[in-house]
Amino acid sequence: MASINDVCKAIVDDIDDALGAAVVDLNTGLLLGVHHNVPYFTTSFMDAVAAAAVEMFRGKGISSVEKRLSQIRGETVSNSMQEVQMTTPKTYHFMSVIPTKPNVLAILITGKQANLGMGWSGLRAAIEELEPLCP
């Protein structure tokens, strides 16, 4: 059986211009698995990326919006962020919560030569492999 790191490696190997892939625990911010081919993606850098992803999906800002929506709608709204695509001057970041594991996030980082559709397709296909491996 493959490990989370093996699946992350397969994502990076299969997608043109992929730089790295990771799986993050949204409760703790800990990396559950990672693979990259960029020398400056150090452990501390990857930890910072994981923490930023947690903030985007479960941070105070989104929690505040979800609380307000809950009040307006009269029903609980939580963990509403499912996918985010972020663009920086040189990279694309694809982030998706694993549907059956609502506290686990899969992340793909590519260069700008990557096709956006292929990035999403590759990450979503890998999620099926990641689901049984994640806590």
What annotation goes with each model-predicted range?
Residues 1-135:
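Non-catalytic interaction/Regulatory regions outside core domains
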